Amino acid sequence: SDVCSGVTWTNNFTALSDDCGATGSATVTFTATDACGNASSSSATFTIEDTTVPSITAAANLTVQCDGAGNLGALNAWLASNGGATASDVCSGVVWTNNFTALSDDCGATGSATVTFTATDACGNASSSIATFTIEDTTVPSIPAAANLTVQCDGAGNPAALTAWLA
């Protein structure tokens, strides 16, 4: 306000700095000038922050039957889909990472891995979901049908015939 004349307001705003996603800040100088050319200025900063973590759905555990080769196709597809988890962020997209290193080898080509899937936005805010990939073997081994064998007594217990039959 000015006691003698009207005041014209101006500012030097050009754009927000784009720190991450839809955030940023700008320091603006506001100037009031009266009809006689007298001016007074004041500066202030306008800031948009993103401190909100991405919204994430839970990753799903997956159990597959052992394929004898490590189930790499199923494992890689599960990892690539972030265990089925999805994420969104109000200010930016997300980048996914996970901490998978290796399957534990419980027996043969089976095992499991507990994996943390993390969605991180452009400002470094992160949300995580944990799930387990398991390879199980529930298939019983197959063996040929055992054949009965009858031999003529040799008086010594037929060790050669017994050994051959057991092999």
List the predicted regions and their residue ranges:
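Proline-threonine-serine-rich low-complexity tracts
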Residues: 1-167
